């Protein structure tokens, strides 16, 4: 999937659920997370100890497209509710998997997948664009200074 299509979906999602830059004054996202159930999405929050025992702390989020379930450890959920950028990125990344229609498949090929074929890149891009749209993350500007 091309970046333009991902951007279209991310921006439309944010607009559809009412999370836009103008509504950024709200510092807690718990009501938004709870409202996902209206759309059939379950946000399953696991106790940190249970998460660590299950995943060996090798991941910080999981998405099951078959059941429309996103599972995260409690520390990610709590920080995301408070608007912490990294925690929000984790949840929006997992939402990206769902909203972009990803299925759990293995890549069987002699070549690495291209960037646009990579589901992780797509979910990261979705999260980046969504976070920009809601005013959490802004594009960093860099200036080249020559002496």
Descriptions of predicted regions:
Residues 1-147:
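Active-site hotspot residues in diverse enzymes, especially metal/ion-binding acidic/histidine motifs
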């Amino acid at each position: 999937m091309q970046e333009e299509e991902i951007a279209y979906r991310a921006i439309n999602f944010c607009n559809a659920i009412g999370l836009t830059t103008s509504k950024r004054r709200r510092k807690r996202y718990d009501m938004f997370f709870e409202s996902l159930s209206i759309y059939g999405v379950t946000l399953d929050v696991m106790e940190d100890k249970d998460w660590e025992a299950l995943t060996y702390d090798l991941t910080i989020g999981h998405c099951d497209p078959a059941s429309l379930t996103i599972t995260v450890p409690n520390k990610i959920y709590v920080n995301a509710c408070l608007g912490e950028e990294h925690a929000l990125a984790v949840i929006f990344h997992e939402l990206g998997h769902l909203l972009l229609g990803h299925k759990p498949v293995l890549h069987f090929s002699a070549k690495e997948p291209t960037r646009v074929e990579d589901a992780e890149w797509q979910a990261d891009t979705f999260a980046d664009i969504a976070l920009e749209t809601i005013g959490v993350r802004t594009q960093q500007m860099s200036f080249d200074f020559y002496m």
